[in-house]
């Protein structure tokens, strides 16, 4: 009986120590933090790149609509990390985006590719690490619905596997 009590006390002490531990920075990707926008979730240090409609992918997003460069702008990601329909804002700006596209180079990364309306704007953006506020998470189900018929491609299968695992 004494051993049982010692184990309970030891377990309680271990739980208290673990819960007091400071969060560790991950070398792999962004960190979640509370956001300043009500109901939003902040993700710090997100790697972003830029693309435009004159590149290989053309002027349509993954769901067949024109890429948007106004109001809520188009963005691409690995949908297993940021699903189709995810809405976010870059902290410190009024720029709001919606994930409506994906790219092969993004699969397996925490990178978001931001749509820019010209090559000059794309080059100006370059590669930046920014904090974002997630305003609304996209839909795993919608992502799978769009990706399902395209599963013959290896990168699509990787996104599907990530979505099904989540």
What are the language-model segments listed below?
Residues 21-166:
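Solvent-exposed, well-ordered loop and adjacent helix/strand elements within mature globular domains
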